[in-house]
């Protein structure tokens, strides 16, 4: 019986990539979106690509970041899936290689209480181009899930996870039910279930 569901955020619970949205607003969209694409396909080191992408945001207004973060579009079916999981008493957590500035408003909207992500460093309301946080490496989600399972006294087969990119592989390895949602091939090959319709309600049919 599933007791915990771990979600990726960008391109999973949220319809898009937070860093690409921020970069576009900062006039750096083309530079960052290509790096994001290669990183999520597993063709670049996640830590190095994250640092490089965030460096392009240097000079951006932090107030603007918060404004954009509060209006990120949720994936179709997100509300319905979260409500379904809650009705089954399944605990929900977000693991994001993105930013708290994006996931925190979404957590409020969806009624999710726990999320792990990174923080955009800023000084005098201006991004410095630096980043820190809990999910900065390709293995971060796996290590975080190990700790969470231990803390909650859960077995691997009591955990499901939903993701789309290469940095979700590590949490797949710690999960009993692995769901690839509109995912890159590197993740699809390791999944128990692949959902190719861009609607999170499809997951309700298979769990």
Curated annotation (Swiss-Prot):
Signal peptide: none annotated. Its EC number is 3.1.3.3. It holds the Pfam family Hydrolase. This is Phosphoserine phosphatase. GO terms for biological process: L-serine biosynthetic process. It catalyses: O-phospho-L-serine + H2O = L-serine + phosphate; O-phospho-D-serine + H2O = D-serine + phosphate. GO terms for cellular component: cytoplasm. Mg(2+) binds at residues 8, 10, 164. PANTHER family: PHOSPHOSERINE PHOSPHATASE. Pathway: Amino-acid biosynthesis; L-serine biosynthesis; L-serine from 3-phospho-D-glycerate: step 3/3. Substrate binds at residues 17, 53, 96-97, 141, 167. It comes from Campylobacter jejuni subsp. doylei (strain ATCC BAA-1458 / RM4099 / 269.97). Keywords: Amino-acid biosynthesis, Hydrolase, Magnesium, Metal-binding, Serine biosynthesis. The active site is at residues 8, 10. InterPro entries: HAD-like_SerB, HAD-like_sf, HAD_sf, PSP. It is an enzyme of class 3 (hydrolase). Its cofactor is Mg(2+). It comes from the Bacteria. Belongs to the HAD-like hydrolase superfamily. SerB family. The keyword Glycosyltransferase does not apply. GO terms for molecular function: L-phosphoserine phosphatase activity; magnesium ion binding.
């Amino acid at each position: 019986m599933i007791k915990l569901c771990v979600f990726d955020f960008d391109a999973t619970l949220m319809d898009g990539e937070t860093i690409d949205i921020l970069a576009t607003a900062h006039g750096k969209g083309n530079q960052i979106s290509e790096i994001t694409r290669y990183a999520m396909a597993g063709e670049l080191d996640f830590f190095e690509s994250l640092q490089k992408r965030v460096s392009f945001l240097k000079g951006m207004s932090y107030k603007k970041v918060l404004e954009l973060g509060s209006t990120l579009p949720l994936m179709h079916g997100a509300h319905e899936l979260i409500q379904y999981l809650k009705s089954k008493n399944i605990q929900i957590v977000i693991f994001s290689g993105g930013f708290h500035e994006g996931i925190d408003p979404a957590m409020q909207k969806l009624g999710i209480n726990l999320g792990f992500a990174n923080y955009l460093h800023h000084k005098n309301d201006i991004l410095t181009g630096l980043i820190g946080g809990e999910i900065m490496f390709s293995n971060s989600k796996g290590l975080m899930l190990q700790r969470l399972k231990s803390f909650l006294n859960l077995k691997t087969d009591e955990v499901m996870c939903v993701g789309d990119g290469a940095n979700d592989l590590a949490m797949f390895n710690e999960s009993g039910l692995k769901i690839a949602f509109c995912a890159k091939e590197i993740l699809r090959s390791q999944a128990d279930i692949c959902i190719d319709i861009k609607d999170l309600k499809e997951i309700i049919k298979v769990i």
